[in-house]
C-alpha cells in the first residue's frame, strides 16, 4: 500500500462513507479496505439478509462500523436516506449485462440518483466505478498508440456492434459528469479493465468466468483476442486513493497489463498443469491480434503499485478452488 501524505489527503478516522452495490466483487474489497482504514461504512444491497452478502458481516471491523441497507437506486428517496450524513460516496453498483433494457435504466438513472442525493447531502467527493469500456470502443482507436483518459468510446459504434454493456456504461459515465457539474459535486471516476483476483463473495463474478472455462474444460480452444487485466485489490485501492487524495480529479484508467488469450492459458498451464487447458486457438489462420495499450500513469503518480498479472491469475484460480467453484485435482491436493 502506498504511503499517504496526510497534508494533502483525508483518511478514515471519524468519516462515514456509502458504498453502493456493496456485495459485488470490487465493492466487497473496497468495503474491506475502508474498514481496515477506520471508516464507518454504509453499504447498499438489494437484501441485507441474503446469505450472499454474509461475507461482508464477517470482515474485520464490520460488527462495529458496517451497516447494510436495502436500497433501490431507481428510487431517489431510498438512496437519500442512506447518503444523508455521509462524508463520501463510492458508487460501484451497476448491472453487468448485454441486455439493453436491463442495462440502460439502472446504469443511467441509478447513477443520476446517487449524484443528486450526494449533492443534497453535501458529501466531500463521489467516486464512480466506470469501465475501460467507456474509453476504447471506437473503430478509430489505434492499437499502436497509448490510450489515456482523454479517449471516449463511440456510442454509435457500441450500438452498431450491439455492445450494450459498453454503451450503457458510457452513457452512464457521460451523464454522471453532466449531473455532477450541474449539482457542483466533486466527482472522480475509476475505469478498470477486466478485474481478477480472490473472491470475497460466494458467487462467481462475470470477469472470472472465462478463466474458469479454461480450467474446467468448457473451453476447448481460446479465441484470437486480447484482454487487459488488473487485480481486484488494486482496483479497490485505486478507489481509496482517488477519494483520499485531495488533488485527484477526472478519470483514472486502472490496468496492469494486457495479454493475448493464448498467453493467459500458457500462464495457467505453468501454474496449474493438472487442468485440461486449451492449447489451440480457434483462429489459426490469422496472426495473434495486438492488444490495446492503456496508460495507468495517473494512478501510478498517486502511488499505486500494480500487482503483476501472473499473480492476478494465480490468486484467481486459488480462490476459485477455495470457494468450491473449481475442483482441486488429486495431484495438487497431495502436494498442497
From Swiss-Prot:
<feature type="binding site">
    <location>
        <position position="52"/>
    </location>
    <ligand>
        <name>NADP(+)</name>
    </ligand>
</feature>
<dbReference type="InterPro" id="IPR036291">
    <property type="entry name" value="NAD(P)-bd_dom_sf"/>
</dbReference>
<feature type="active site" description="Proton donor">
    <location>
        <position position="169"/>
    </location>
</feature>
<dbReference type="GO" id="GO:0016621">
    <property type="term" value="F:cinnamoyl-CoA reductase activity"/>
</dbReference>
<feature type="binding site">
    <location>
        <position position="207"/>
    </location>
    <ligand>
        <name>NADP(+)</name>
    </ligand>
</feature>
<feature type="binding site">
    <location>
        <begin position="21"/>
        <end position="27"/>
    </location>
    <ligand>
        <name>NADP(+)</name>
    </ligand>
</feature>
<dbReference type="GO" id="GO:0005737">
    <property type="term" value="C:cytoplasm"/>
</dbReference>
<dbReference type="Pfam" id="PF01370">
    <property type="entry name" value="Epimerase"/>
</dbReference>
<keyword id="KW-0963">Cytoplasm</keyword>
<dbReference type="GO" id="GO:0009809">
    <property type="term" value="P:lignin biosynthetic process"/>
</dbReference>
<feature type="binding site">
    <location>
        <begin position="192"/>
        <end position="195"/>
    </location>
    <ligand>
        <name>NADP(+)</name>
    </ligand>
</feature>
<comment type="pathway">
    <text>Aromatic compound metabolism; phenylpropanoid biosynthesis.</text>
</comment>
<feature type="binding site">
    <location>
        <position position="46"/>
    </location>
    <ligand>
        <name>NADP(+)</name>
    </ligand>
</feature>
<dbReference type="InterPro" id="IPR001509">
    <property type="entry name" value="Epimerase_deHydtase"/>
</dbReference>
<comment type="similarity">
    <text>Belongs to the NAD(P)-dependent epimerase/dehydratase family. Dihydroflavonol-4-reductase subfamily.</text>
</comment>
<dbReference type="GO" id="GO:0016616">
    <property type="term" value="F:oxidoreductase activity, acting on the CH-OH group of donors, NAD or NADP as acceptor"/>
</dbReference>
<feature type="disulfide bond">
    <location>
        <begin position="158"/>
        <end position="166"/>
    </location>
</feature>
<protein>
    <recommendedName>
        <fullName>Cinnamoyl-CoA reductase 2</fullName>
        <ecNumber>1.2.1.44</ecNumber>
        <ecNumber>1.2.1.-</ecNumber>
    </recommendedName>
</protein>
<feature type="binding site">
    <location>
        <begin position="72"/>
        <end position="73"/>
    </location>
    <ligand>
        <name>NADP(+)</name>
    </ligand>
</feature>
<feature type="binding site">
    <location>
        <begin position="92"/>
        <end position="94"/>
    </location>
    <ligand>
        <name>NADP(+)</name>
    </ligand>
</feature>
<keyword id="KW-0560">Oxidoreductase</keyword>
<dbReference type="InterPro" id="IPR050425">
    <property type="entry name" value="NAD(P)_dehydrat-like"/>
</dbReference>
<feature type="binding site">
    <location>
        <position position="165"/>
    </location>
    <ligand>
        <name>NADP(+)</name>
    </ligand>
</feature>
<dbReference type="GO" id="GO:0009699">
    <property type="term" value="P:phenylpropanoid biosynthetic process"/>
</dbReference>
<keyword id="KW-1015">Disulfide bond</keyword>
<comment type="function">
    <text>Involved in the latter stages of lignin biosynthesis. Catalyzes one of the last steps of monolignol biosynthesis, the conversion of cinnamoyl-CoAs into their corresponding cinnamaldehydes. Mediates the conversion of caffeoyl-CoA and coumaroyl-CoA to caffaldehyde and coumaraldehyde, respectively. Also active, with a lower efficiency, toward feruloyl-CoA and sinapoyl-CoA. Involved in the production of floral volatile phenylpropanoids in flowers of fragrant cultivars from cinnamic acid, a common precursor with the anthocyanin biosynthesis pathway involved in flower pigmentation.</text>
</comment>
<keyword id="KW-0521">NADP</keyword>
<feature type="binding site">
    <location>
        <position position="169"/>
    </location>
    <ligand>
        <name>NADP(+)</name>
    </ligand>
</feature>
Amino acid at each position: 500500500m502506498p504511503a499517504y501524505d496526510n497534508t494533502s489527503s483525508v483518511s478514515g478516522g471519524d468519516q462515514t462513507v456509502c458504498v453502493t452495490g456493496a456485495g459485488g466483487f470490487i465493492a466487497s474489497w473496497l468495503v474491506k479496505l475502508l474498514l481496515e482504514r477506520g471508516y464507518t461504512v454504509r453499504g447498499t444491497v438489494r437484501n441485507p439478509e441474503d446469505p450472499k452478502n454474509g461475507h461482508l458481516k464477517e470482515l474485520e471491523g464490520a460488527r462495529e462500523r458496517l451497516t447494510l441497507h436495502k436500497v433501490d437506486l431507481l428510487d431517489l428517496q431510498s438512496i437519500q436516506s442512506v447518503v444523508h450524513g455521509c462524508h463520501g460516496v463510492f458508487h460501484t453498483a451497476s448491472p453487468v449485462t448485454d441486455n439493453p433494457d436491463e442495462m440502460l435504466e439502472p446504469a443511467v438513472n441509478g447513477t443520476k440518483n446517487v449524484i443528486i442525493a450526494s449533492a443534497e447531502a453535501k458529501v466531500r467527493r463521489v467516486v464512480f466505478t466506470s469501465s475501460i469500456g467507456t474509453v476504447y470502443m471506437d473503430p478509430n482507436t489505434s492499437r499502436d498508440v497509448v490510450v489515456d483518459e482523454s479517449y471516449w468510446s463511440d456510442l454509435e459504434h457500441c450500438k452498431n456492434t450491439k455492445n450494450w454493456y459498453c454503451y450503457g456504461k458510457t452513457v452512464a459515465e457521460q451523464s454522471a459528469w453532466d449531473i455532477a457539474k450541474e449539482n457542483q459535486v466533486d466527482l472522480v471516476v475509476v475505469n478498470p479493465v477486466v478485474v481478477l483476483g480472490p473472491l470475497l463473495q460466494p458467487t462467481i463474478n462475470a470477469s472470472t468466468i472465462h478463466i474458469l472455462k479454461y480450467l474446467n474444460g468448457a473451453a476447448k480452444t481460446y479465441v484470437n483476442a486480447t484482454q487487459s487485466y488488473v487485480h481486484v485489490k488494486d482496483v479497490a485501492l485505486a478507489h481509496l486513493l482517488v477519494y483520499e487524495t485531495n488533488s485527484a480529479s477526472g478519470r483514472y484508467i486502472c490496468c496492469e497489463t494486457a495479454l493475448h488469450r493464448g498467453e493467459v492459458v500458457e500462464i495457467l498451464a505453468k501454474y496449474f498443469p493438472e487442468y485440461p487447458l486449451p492449447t489451440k486457438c480457434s483462429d489459426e489462420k490469422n496472426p495473434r491480434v495486438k492488444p490495446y495499450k492503456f496508460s495507468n500513469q495517473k494512478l501510478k503518480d498517486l502511488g499505486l503499485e500494480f500487482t503483476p498479472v501472473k499473480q492476478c491469475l494465480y490468486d484467481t484460480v486459488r480462490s476459485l478452488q477455495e470457494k468450491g467453484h473449481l475442483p482441486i485435482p488429486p495431484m495438487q491436493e497431495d502436494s498442497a
